[in-house]
Amino acid sequence: MSVASFFSSLPARPFGYKDGRGRTGMVPTTDIGRRMVKPPVLACRPIESNTYHGSVTSVFLTKSSRSPSPSLSPTPTALDDEIVLDLKPFLIIYKSGRIERFLGTTVIPACPEVATKDVVIDPATGVSVRLYLPNVVDLPSKKLPVLVYFHGGGFVIENTGSPNYHNYLTLLAAKAGVLIVSINYRLAPEYPLPASYDDCMAGFNWVVSHSAGPALEPWLAQHGDFSQILLSGDSAGGNVTHYVAMRADAGVIEGVAIVHPYFLGSEPVGNEINDPANIEFHDKLWRLAAPDTEGLDDPLINPVAPGAPSLAGLKCKRAVVFVAGNDFLVERGRMYYEALVKSGWRGEAELVQHEGVGHVFHLSDYSGDISVAMMTKLIAFLKGE
């Protein structure tokens, strides 16, 4: 039985399903095996780890309450011994329907000390955003550029509260002086695509709605400069950034920063040619996230495939594409940039490549020379410099 047919045979919200709130980055092997979490910076601190069935998840203490681990279904059953799909180090799916996530399940609570908070934007789906507001005490009326951010994780892991994302975006907000809205979208396989895309589009539209009409969120209403809306995301979030920018209304988005984008294709290119195991892994991962997909040349995962919508339709004035030389996906990012430039798109585009580093390296090493250079470049882009 295929993975898609297995899930379609289960009843709605089967025993053991979660709400899709655990995740992490992208490619599973070698340089994209995924980062170890460094001690949180400007964030709540981890106090212990719990190990269960080989899955290690950190538990955080906020005042006197503990944040539950989202990595495992509530109670294992006898059927948990039978594995339907093994996608370690990301996740394992058991015949019972239980999903065990190994990465990206830790959640750091929003911390008032650094002006962050979580807001549910759709009670029906549970989709929320985490906002990051830089210090505006001295300039309470100052308007800030608004950065809408989409996290990575192959559409199956990670969340806005993960230490890597929380710490990185806290640092970026402080250094760049931007108001960041990070979208906590639903995950596959519990919520197959296009759920993630729909949630991110809804989050983007929620932000834009503050430019006119009743104020929904005071931080955005008081401090957001809606003439300076920017999008960014890494890995799967880079994929989503492209998706949203292709579907937004013209004139709304100032610029997009696409970081180490999760794009694939049926024909191996670059680093992929000598790594068939990674290709096989990502083919399985993509089909898990998008069971109705056309395959690796689906325009959702391969925006430069024959028949894909022209990149001339990207709805922004400026774009920067970041790639990493040791990234399995590096050639896909280059191909996207080249296709954008040749498409007839009328904006300004730039490709930034960092050698000797792998997929989303900047999320686990904030102080390294290359990470600092990358953030400096990103900040300059956000400021229009």
Swiss-Prot record:
Q: How does activity depend on pH?
A: Optimum pH is 6.5-7.5.
A Pfam family that the UniProt record links to this protein: Abhydrolase_3
Enzyme class, spelled out: lyase
Q: What is the effect of changing H359A?
A: Loss of activity
Q: Which GO terms describe its cellular component?
A: chloroplast
EC assignment: the record states 4.2.99.22
State whether keyword Lipoprotein applies.
Answer: no
The record's listing under InterPro entries reads:
AB_hydrolase_3 (IPR013094), AB_hydrolase_fold (IPR029058), Carboxylest/Gibb_receptor (IPR050466)
The effect annotated for H362A is: 94% reduction of activity
- Assembly information from the UniProt record: Homodimer.
Other comments on record: 6-tuliposide A and tuliposide A-converting enzyme, which are compartmentalized in the vacuoles and plastids respectively, come into contact with each other for the enzyme reaction releasing toxic tulipalin A upon cell disruption by pathogen infection or herbivore predation.
UniProt protein name: Tuliposide A-converting enzyme 1, chloroplastic
What organism is the protein native to? Tulipa gesneriana
